[in-house]
Structures are given as structure tokens and as C-alpha cells.
UniProtKB/Swiss-Prot annotation:
The chain crosses the membrane at residues 18-38, 79-99, 109-129, 139-159, 166-186, 200-220, 281-301, 316-336, 348-368, 380-400, 423-443, 449-469. PANTHER family: IP12678P (PTHR23500:SF357), SOLUTE CARRIER FAMILY 2, FACILITATED GLUCOSE TRANSPORTER (PTHR23500). Residues 1-17, 100-108, 160-165, 221-280, 337-347, 401-422, 470-515 are cytoplasmic. It is a multi-pass membrane protein. GO terms for cellular component: membrane. Mediates active uptake of hexoses by sugar:proton symport. Can transport glucose, fructose, mannose and galactose. Can transport xylose and ribose. It comes from Oryza sativa subsp. japonica. The gene is MST4. Belongs to the major facilitator superfamily. Sugar transporter (TC 2.A.1.1) family. This is Sugar transport protein MST4. The keyword Secreted does not apply.
Length: 515
């Protein structure tokens, strides 16, 4: 396998080969993203199926087939939106418990708990006889999302060698996109199965749920997690195993030092608010808010519903959603290749321009061609809308999609990493919930201007990246403070060298263990 060295801030070289166990562990752990993506993708297709609406939302079905209802308002129903968004509200709540389990029980066991929640939730959804069972199933799936999204990005960032950390971490987002595509393909097939096709759509979530559960049973926990829980020898043995070398002392000592400082922190959530941790916290929180206000989840949740609204028939709308799902997967592969080469900032800035232009174009086309009563786009215009949606999705998929998870998971010091990831997931799910719950109502009231609304947010977030987001590629995870935050023109003012938690002297010199 390929070998190499990761250079630490103190000049110490961390020897690390790209070993099969690292690749396999990362692939298995990243199936948590597969489950998340399937849950995101499946709800939009299911809620556009007449059989599903007849069973649970007959009033929406009636509105859908009545000409008197505005095209933009056919699906404006709080109960229907709650079906989609309840998952994210449950995930938000579960995140607080997941922070405790990742710290006390480890990353691996937390992923196993997520898998169990997913399996039980799938059973409830597939067998749902009424709306209550349906919502309970979504809530259980949401708990799984909370635990998985807490543990998986941390696991990937900690187990990966520094020089390919970005690419391996993006496996999580790649699996999210594959899950969405899988869901779109399933919906395209099950829409033709009457009257129980929707049950099959919801039940097939059991496949990614089983993969995550089995994966969590067989992967090793991260050295950082084992050492943090006092299992030093086991942590060193795992470090040797995953790095493919016996020469792990420098990296081991750095993790031990970071862990020692982490043990002194009794209240990690309170510690997040301390001045020296504010840059990481602000970046993590804003990245999650900005990620949702690109409008991506609004489009991915409701792609079939959205295309239906624009005048596509059910088959055509699901087919168009499959196309956008495929573009999502392929574009995320671009990020896997380029994130450790061109860096995080460049991908985000390029995507900002592309997302802005495509959303403005969609708003203009819809403003001209789709009115409250007329949705006859015409073949050429319809193709243009799909192309513009794909252009938008592709730019998101190689930027804000994966990097919204990668950057927070690699910037927090060990002492606040679990708490920081918890806040990251919590904010992400909170704003995902807000968008999921509000989108169909916003579409009803703003109409085509909803895309102009999201494009304005893209301008704001791109300016933030330009001025305030530091580059983190090829920086060892335990050395972000010294080599990133203390060097940044704005954030360095929050870094206090006198703070004993920053750099612990070792024979009069920094050993590079920053926290």
C-alpha cells in the first residue's frame, strides 16, 4: 500500500501508510451516510404518490387533483411537512445523548446504537397502519440520524491519515448522495406498484440500516477514542494497525497529550463557549446554517413534488429526481478527488458562483413560465429547469455538502471535539427541520422568488468563506490551533498563548499537542 509521512507542527513526522483496514473501516462507517441519504430522498417521492396520500393525507390528494388550487400551493400541508421534518427534530434531540455516548462509550458503539434505531424505525414505517405509526417510525429514524451523524464524521476524521483525511471523510457525504439516488430509483420503481408501493419504499431503508449495524460490529474504534477513555495500550495497538507501521510514538504521544488535557475538562459544552474555542464554534455553527440556506435540502426532499408543481407528470418528476440524484453522486466524487489537492476554500468559493447563477436562472424561468393556474413549461423550458437544478446540485455536492461535515469534524480540539460535533449536528438538524417544515409553505407564498431568496443567502455565505474561513487541508487534526487559528488574520485575536490548555511545554519546547 502507499506509504508516507504527515508532518506535525513541531516538525515531527507521523509515519502512516494507507492501509486496507483504514479504507475498509471508513467505507463501513460511512454507510451511516447511506441511511441518512435514503431517509432524505425517500420522503419526497413517497409524498408524491397518490396511494400514500390516499392512506394518510386525503385532503392533500384532493387539493392535488383540483384545478382551483394554485400550482405552488398544492402540497402546502403542515401534517405532510411534519412527516418529512419529524425525523430531523428527533435527530436534534438525540444528538445530546449521542455526544455522551461518543465520549464515554466510543465512536463505534455509538454507530451501533444508531443502527438499532434505524432498524426499529424502518419496521414501524413499513408496517404503518395510521399516521401515528408513521410519525413514530420517522422519529426513531431521526434518533438514528442523530447518533450516526455525531459518530461517523468523528470516526472518519480520527482514523484517516492526515494527507487523505478530507477524501476519506467525504465518504460520509458520498454515501448520503448514494442513499438519495437509491431512494429516487426505488421511488421510480415503486410508484408503479399499487396500492402498496410506498410501503416497499419505506421498508427498503432496512438495507442501509443493516449495513451500518453490521459495519459497527466489525470496525475498530479510533485510537483517539480509546486513549480518551484510558485504554492506552489498546489505542497504541490500533494505531499501529491502522497506520501500518510500528513507528507510531510521535502520533501516539500527541494524542495522549491531547487526551490528558481533555480529561481536565469537566464541562465540554461550557468549554466550547470559552474565548479560545469561539472561532471553531462560530465556523461550525455558521457552516451548518449556510448549508441549509443554500436550498439544497428543499430541492432534494421535495424534488418529485417540486417537478410535479412545475407541470411534470408523476413519472417524469420522479425520473427528473433520479437524474439530479445521479448528478449529486458523481459531483461528490469530484470532491473526494480534489478536497486534499485544491483545498476547502477554493471548492466553496467556486461553488458559490455556480449556485448563485443557477438559482437566479431557475427563478427567472419559473417567473416567466409558471403561474398560479398555468404550469405548461414546454419541453425546452422543462429541460432547462432540470439542467439548472443539476448545475446547482453538482456545485453543492462538491462543496457545501461534504465540507459542511468535514470542516467542523477536523477543527475542534479533542477536549471539545465530541461536544463540538454535537452542536454541529444539532444546528444542522435544527435548520434542516426548519427548511423541511417551511419549504412547501414558502413555495406557496414566495412562488418562484424562493430561488431568489436562496441565491441571496449564497452570496452571504460566499463572502463569509472569502474573509473568515481558514484553509485546513493537510493540517494534522491535533494541531489546528497552532497552525490554523493562531495564524488567521481575524481569529488569532481569540487565541491566548498564556492559556495553559493551548500548548503544553515539553522540555521547554512545544510538542505540538494543541487543544
Amino acid at each position: 500500500m502507499a506509504g508516507g509521512f504527515s508532518v506535525s507542527g513541531s516538525g515531527v513526522e507521523f509515519e502512516a501508510k494507507i492501509t486496507p483496514i483504514v479504507i475498509i473501516s471508513c467505507i463501513m462507517a460511512a454507510t451511516g451516510g447511506l441511511m441518512f441519504g435514503y431517509d432524505v430522498g425517500i420522503s419526497g417521492g413517497v409524498t408524491s404518490m397518490d396511494d400514500f396520500l390516499r392512506e394518510f393525507f386525503p385532503t392533500v390528494l384532493k387539493k392535488k387533483h383540483e384545478d382551483k388550487e394554485s400550482n405552488y400551493c398544492k402540497y402546502d400541508n403542515q401534517g405532510l411537512q411534519l412527516f418529512t421534518s419529524s425525523l430531523y427534530l428527533a435527530g436534534l434531540t438525540a444528538t445530546f445523548f449521542a455526544s455522551y455516548t461518543t465520549r464515554r462509550l466510543g465512536r463505534r458503539l455509538t454507530m451501533l446504537i444508531a443502527g438499532v434505531f434505524f432498524i426499529v424505525g424502518v419496521i414501524f414505517n413499513g408496517a404503518a397502519q395510521n399516521l401515528a405509526m408513521l410519525i413514530v417510525g420517522r422519529i426513531l429514524l431521526g434518533c438514528g440520524v442523530g447518533f450516526a451523524n455525531q459518530a461517523v464524521p468523528l470516526f472518519l476524521s480520527e482514523i484517516a491519515p492526515t494527507r487523505i483525511r478530507g477524501g476519506l471523510n467525504i465518504l460520509f457525504q458520498l454515501n448520503v448522495t448514494i442513499g438519495i439516488l437509491f431512494a429516487n430509483l426505488v421511488n421510480y420503481g415503486t410508484a408503479k406498484i399499487h396500492p402498496w408501493g410506498w410501503r416497499l419504499s419505506l421498508s427498503l431503508a432496512g438495507i442501509p440500516a443493516a449495513l451500518l449495524t453490521l459495519g459497527a460490529l466489525f470496525v475498530v474504534d479510533t485510537p483517539n477514542s480509546l486513549i480518551e477513555r484510558g485504554r492506552l495500550e489498546e489505542g497504541k495497538a490500533v494505531l499501529r494497525k491502522i497506520r501500518g507501521t510500528d513507528n507510531v510514538e510521535p502520533e501516539f504521544n500527541e494524542i495522549v497529550e491531547a487526551s490528558r488535557v481533555a480529561q481536565e475538562v469537566k464541562h465540554p459544552f461550557r468549554n466550547l463557549l470559552q474565548r479560545r474555542n469561539r472561532p471553531q464554534l462560530v465556523i461550525a455553527v455558521l457552516l451548518q446554517i449556510f448549508q441549509q440556506f443554500t436550498g439544497i435540502n428543499a430541492i432534494m426532499f421535495y424534488a418529485p413534488v417540486l417537478f410535479n408543481t412545475l407541470g411534470f407528470k408523476t413519472d417524469a418528476s420522479l425520473y427528473s429526481a433520479v437524474i439530479t440524484g445521479a448528478v449529486n453522486v458523481l459531483s461528490t466524487l469530484v470532491s473526494v478527488y480534489s478536497v486534499d489537492r485544491v483545498g476547502r476554500r477554493m471548492l466553496l468559493l467556486e461553488a458559490g458562483v455556480q449556485m448563485f447563477l443557477s438559482q437566479v436562472a431557475i427563478a427567472v424561468v419559473l417567473g416567466i413560465k409558471v403561474t398560479d393556474r398555468s404550469d405548461n413549461l414546454g419541453h425546452g423550458w422543462a429541460i432547462m429547469v432540470v439542467v439548472m437544478v443539476c448545475t446547482f446540485v453538482s456545485s453543492f455536492a462538491w462543496s457545501w455538502g461534504p465540507l459542511g461535515w468535514l470542516i467542523p469534524s477536523e477543527t475542534f480540539p479533542l477536549e471539545t471535539r465530541s461536544a463540538g460535533q454535537s452542536v454541529t449536528v444539532c444546528v444542522n438538524l435544527l435548520f434542516t427541520f426548519v427548511i423541511a417544515q417551511a419549504f412547501l409553505s414558502m413555495l406557496c407564498h414566495l412562488k418562484y422568488a424562493i430561488f431568489a431568496f436562496f441565491s441571496a443567502w449564497v452570496v452571504v455565505m460566499s463572502l463569509f468563506v472569502l474573509f473568515f474561513l481558514p484553509e485546513t487541508k493537510n493540517i494534522p487534526i491535533e494541531e489546528m490551533t497552532e497552525r490554523v487559528w493562531k495564524q488567521h488574520w481575524f481569529w488569532k485575536r481569540f487565541m491566548d498563548d498564556a492559556d495553559k490548555h493551548h500548548v503544553v511545554p515539553n522540555g521547554g519546547k512545544s510538542n505540538g499537542a494543541t487543544v
